[in-house]
């Protein structure tokens, strides 16, 4: 398709002006983690503007510590009757680590439950005019352009209707490396500009080299354009946000001069597979309990989850520049899970970081299958374990360190749970197969029996299950109490059925995810880097042979654990069966939960329904319609050959190419750049050049005006004698 073949694109000039505004460079220096920078922390503008109430920390963190100490004492008492053996000490230590982890979530859940019982409403700041400027950033990496650009189109249009549109500029920041997707992005941007240029300022930039991934993408924007704006509202490629939420965030930031970052709690939407629906339902029913409780007690020392949050540009650029960690990945190099670190550094500098748990209208999507979840978690696991290098940073608030530690434990907890299961199994096998030493060297009229307090052990088991499932129970109680909420998910009966189904299916998936996380931790400890793979967001289905290969070790582990249990007794096998069944049937579970067809069956039945699915927000409906329209607009994708052939298309493409200098004078030429230069220079026609360029090299050519001009000057015709051979 050429420019003249589409009425929307009948122009050689980019509608709405330049693809990016004029640069206003600003400094964003990497922070020193080994010492506190001069001038930090800043003095708060408002008295007590960044001070939190200690009483809330005492209630939640103190309560979690007391609960953990009680449980650890009880576990010690279970073993202490007959004397504690080394293996029992190991069980006790592993139990202590795991229980502390769930106790904090439980106590946060209690706080969230009590707050949500009162049905809090978002604070009305009554700000009539925004005098600050906010850049809304939509980073994208090899995503479907129809999804990304249609979402921006809808959000920009609805925001313009509020009367506050003048205070916001929109930026799509692409790190795409696929040349086909890069050209589709340009097509979609032309459509977006045509639709929005009369009411919104929308821009597009694709980096030539995606250094430091998403964090580097945003940092590049800040260094070149950040000084133009007071705030940055960071989205993700699957984000949606209502106009009232966008303006509400900007108003809160404007009203609080000490606010450095305000994070929303996004609701999950658009799940089509059973796995996505499961995550949506759990996040909607139980998530607010944990999120609200967390936001309540962390107060000014909140966290950043990488998107759907607004950041003060000054705080971000002066305090959150990320350094490279010494060494190679996975523990060295660029900081992968940048969000937690950026929040900690912003708080270190004296700005507040707040979780806006009372602000609705923020949305995102979730992985469609167990395999897609595993791919994402492998990357997150590496980034979170990398935070072990960040924990000693000078000047961090202790709550910020706790955020980093909980992120680490989100993945280390799986190996700890597995070790606890294995040591418990070893205790059972030891009691069954190893003959006890009835009479010791010390004189006694009575034998020494290996005994433990079974009644206390059973009571502790019930307590542990109560702590583990407590947040779920709180979420269900809130659902049953609120008739309107219950009706929004299909009524109380369907809601209870959905909860039961979610608990059972989650219990089957949990051991699979435990082994997936254990494998991720092991591969990281072995020095393997995760790389950066694009995410699938819609269909999660895979061939059965692929699933068998991906879950082969999980099934084998389930069989081996079951065999070990049955060596002791059928009773032990029955006790372990909730954790083993999921491993035995990992392949069908993975296949069924990743299926759109099965997800559709549950949708029609009203199982695992959410309010956002049954009564979608207007912006979600508009985004769905707009995406279908964008799919039609870019149904005939451009190619590099067409760009070279059509002068008008070439001019439009060059208008969207990043204007940053290709290479600073005197800097070394990268190997791939040199190879591309040779291939282009030695080609005798466009077709022969395109025949020898791989996809990565084509992406580089698309971002290089000099190479494009050189190729454009070549004749199009391909003749045999023009072939160039390379070794």
Curated annotation (Swiss-Prot):
Any one biological process term the GO annotation gives: glucan biosynthetic process
Localization per record: Cell inner membrane
Pathway field: Glycan metabolism; osmoregulated periplasmic glucan (OPG) biosynthesis
InterPro entries referenced in this protein's UniProt entry, alphabetically: Glucans_biosynth_gluTrFase_H, Glyco_trans_2-like, Glycosyltr_2/OpgH_subfam, Nucleotide-diphossugar_trans
Any Gene Ontology CC annotation: plasma membrane
Keywords: Cell inner membrane, Cell membrane, Glycosyltransferase, Membrane, Transferase, Transmembrane, Transmembrane helix
Location of region: Disordered: 18-38
HAMAP family: MdoH_OpgH (MF_01072)
Family under the similarity heading: Belongs to the glycosyltransferase 2 family. OpgH subfamily.
NCBIfam families associated with the record: PRK05454.1-3 (NF003956), PRK05454.2-1 (NF003958), PRK05454.2-5 (NF003962)
Protein name: Glucans biosynthesis glucosyltransferase H
Species of origin: Shewanella baltica (strain OS185)
Name of encoding gene: opgH
